[in-house]
Amino acid sequence: MNLQRFPRYPLTFGPTPIQPLKRLSAHLGGKVKLYAKREDCNSGLAFGGNKTRKLEYLIPDALAQGADTLVSIGGVQSNQTRQVAAVAAHLGMKCVLVQEHWVNYDDPVYDRVGNIQLSRMMGADVRLVADGFDIGIRRSWEEAMESVRQAGGKPYPIPAGCSEHPLGGLGFVGFAEEVRAQEAELGFKFDYIVVCSVTGSTQAGMVVGFAADGRADRVIGIDASATPEKTHAQITRIARHTAEIVELGRRIDEQDVVLDTRYAGPEYGLPNDGTLEAIRLCARLEGVLTDPVYEGKSMHGMIDKVRLGEFEPGSKVLYAHLGGVPALSAYAEIFRNG
């Protein structure tokens, strides 16, 4: 596997820490040892997160093309767009963000606080669009890029989650290589890696990276899209492309992509009772915060799988904490009593 042939622009602090979740593990019976890899602490750029790791491989391409404006898209409370805005500010570039109405959540401050507030503070041109949720290429995003061209700028396209970008899977191939180096220091290997999946390139990169040592199907995606067929297909397609460009040496098969679809409801961006219980449990036992859109759902999935005995006794499970905490203030009404 040859990740090193791709240029990388450093936006993160370095390898993210692996933290044992001792109290949560004990609360769940102690037979499975839970750990978290803290991608939510990976950068000093506006809280960082998993997209910042991905952007390290997109930014060299943007600079090589002479782009002056990063153009990205997401929902109103998109973590992706906040991270793109931060990187643009850091590099002295312009930033246009398309924020679509992906979540059916009615709150008068939803589009004024959290991620979107931070993006505005960092100088991004934020454009609210009424279109609903979809993980594919969006008309509104293409129109935003054309508007930059018409104004004499040179846009660089960064799709939702970086996922439809040809280099979007590379960052989390690097994540797998980083985990292997940390495992050598820890003296053990993780039996499973749990990760939230929506647009797909985070899990896709992990699948390719862990395929290098035979653990592709030990990456357990927890769907948060509530459109699992689309998400599974997109993970598989991105993983196959990424495997080719990093010269993995084997094809990614359907069985390499594991996506648990039980925890996404009621729909994208809205938590269920299990999501909320997982958020509160992790916060109160570990002081680790997760959000109701992504990490609360993957935390719910991991906790439930432990309770159901779906991880063998003695297993060591690594939870990939991808970020998302800045969105919590947009859901303040849900958590008004903690």
Curated annotation (Swiss-Prot):
Quaternary structure and interacting proteins, as annotated: Homotrimer.
Residues with the N6-(pyridoxal phosphate)lysine modification:
51
Catalytically driven reaction(s): 1-aminocyclopropane-1-carboxylate + H2O = 2-oxobutanoate + NH4(+)
InterPro entries xrefs: ACCD_DCysDesulf, ACP_carboxylate_deaminase, ACP_carboxylate_deaminase_bac, TrpB-like_PALP, TrpB-like_PALP_sf
Keyword annotations:
Hydrolase, Pyridoxal phosphate
Q: Does the keyword tRNA-binding apply?
A: no
Name of this chain's protein: 1-aminocyclopropane-1-carboxylate deaminase
Question: Per its record, what are the GO molecular function terms?
Answer: 1-aminocyclopropane-1-carboxylate deaminase activity; D-cysteine desulfhydrase activity; pyridoxal phosphate binding
Give the UniProt family note: Belongs to the ACC deaminase/D-cysteine desulfhydrase family.
List of catalytic residues: 78
Q: Which top-level group of life is the source organism from?
A: Bacteria
**Signal sequence interval, chain numbering:** none
Question: What cofactor requirement does the entry state?
Answer: pyridoxal 5'-phosphate
Its organism's taxonomic lineage begins at: Bacteria, Pseudomonadati, Pseudomonadota, Betaproteobacteria, Burkholderiales
The record's Gene Ontology biological-process terms are: 1-aminocyclopropane-1-carboxylate metabolic process; amine catabolic process
Q: Which Pfam families match?
A: PALP
Q: Which Gene3D superfamilies match?
A: 3.40.50.1100
Record function comment: Catalyzes a cyclopropane ring-opening reaction, the irreversible conversion of 1-aminocyclopropane-1-carboxylate (ACC) to ammonia and alpha-ketobutyrate. Allows growth on ACC as a nitrogen source.
> NCBIfam families recorded for this chain?
ACC_deam (TIGR01274)
Give the E.C. number(s).
3.5.99.7
